[in-house]
């Protein structure tokens, strides 16, 4: 403000009047009156400008954009690594399947008939059982069990062994003899009838059977 008063004092009367006209002030009076009017006007307007600047400053502060906070993504668990590990485990398990079981599955996939022996071998390999043919064993053990039961029943009730038990014993002996000499056909039974008759007599004498 001191600089403005100095400048006003330097102005001439005509220049002061022009300043007053420009600001809508009266031009009447001496030079000092014009200077006082201009100073009062400038002081009033200086306060208004200061207030406007303060208001504008507040508005600009309010209008300052706030920093946008980006959402922080949570770290997801490594699912891919787990999937890869499970796939590897599955591959290892499938590689340990026995060859017989794989052949059976392949035959089922392509609708190819699978033999009974291969099925048995696959089942035995699956459960860890040795695949030994049990046809001969089952056929040989059945008559023995039946004979023992018949003998026990006959001894329990004090009865003689029936002709059925004798026939089964003879059949069993014939079968064993055929297996011993490698005879397969049933025609060899005629040549061994004498031996069986002699054995029948000896057995009857031993057990006191009439």
From Swiss-Prot:
Basic and acidic residues biased stretches: 65-87
PROSITE patterns according to UniProt: SAP
Disulfide bridge positions per record: none
A single GO cellular-component term on record: nucleus
Modification type Phosphoserine: residues: 163
Oligomeric and partner information: Interacts with DDX39A. Interacts with FUS. Interacts (via the C-terminal domain) with DDX39B; the interaction is direct and facilitates RNA binding of DDX39B. Component of the transcription/export (TREX) complex at least composed of ALYREF/THOC4, DDX39B, SARNP/CIP29, CHTOP and the THO subcomplex; TREX seems to have dynamic structure involving ATP-dependent remodeling; in the complex interacts directly with DDX39B in a ATP-dependent manner which bridges it to ALYREF/THOC4.
Modified sites of kind N-acetylalanine: 2
InterPro entries: SAP_dom (IPR003034), SAP_dom_sf (IPR036361), SAP_domain_ribonucleoprotein (IPR052240)
Keywords: Acetylation, DNA-binding, mRNA transport, Nucleus, Phosphoprotein, RNA-binding, Transcription, Transcription regulation, Translation regulation, Transport
GO biological process, one term: negative regulation of transcription by RNA polymerase II
Similarity comment: family membership: Belongs to the SAP domain-containing ribonucleoprotein family.
UniProt source species: Mus musculus (Mouse)
SMART domains cross-referenced by the UniProt entry: SAP (SM00513)
Composition-biased stretches (Acidic residues): 45-64
Compositional bias segments (type: Polar residues): 184-193
Keyword set includes Magnesium: no
Example of a GO MF term: DNA binding
Cellular localisation: Nucleus; Nucleus speckle
Modified sites of kind N6-acetyllysine: 10, 142
Source organism, top-level taxon: Eukaryota
Name recorded for this polypeptide: SAP domain-containing ribonucleoprotein
Transport recorded as keyword: yes
């Amino acid at each position: 403000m001191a600089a403005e008063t100095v400048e006003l004092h330097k102005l001439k009367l005509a220049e002061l009047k022009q300043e007053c006209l420009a600001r809508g002030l009266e031009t009447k009076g001496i030079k000092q009156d014009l200077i006082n009017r201009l100073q009062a006007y400038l002081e009033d307007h200086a306060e208004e400008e200061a207030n406007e600047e303060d208001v504008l400053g507040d508005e600009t502060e309010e209008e300052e954009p706030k920093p946008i906070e980006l959402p922080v993504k949570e770290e997801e668990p490594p699912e891919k690594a787990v999937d890869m590990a499970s796939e590897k485990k599955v591959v290892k398990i499938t590689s340990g399947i026995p060859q017989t079981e794989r052949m059976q599955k392949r035959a089922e996939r392509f609708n190819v008939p699978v033999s009974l022996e291969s099925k048995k071998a696959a089942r035995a390999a699956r459960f860890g059982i040795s695949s030994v043919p049990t046809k001969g064993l089952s056929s040989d053990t059945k008559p023995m069990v039946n004979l023992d039961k018949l003998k026990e029943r006959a001894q329990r009730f004090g009865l003689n062994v029936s002709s059925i038990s004798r026939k089964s014993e003879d059949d069993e002996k014939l079968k064993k003899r055929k297996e011993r000499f490698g005879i397969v056909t049933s025609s060899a039974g005629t040549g061994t009838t004498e031996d069986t008759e002699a054995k029948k007599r000896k057995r009857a004498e031993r057990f006191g059977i009439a």
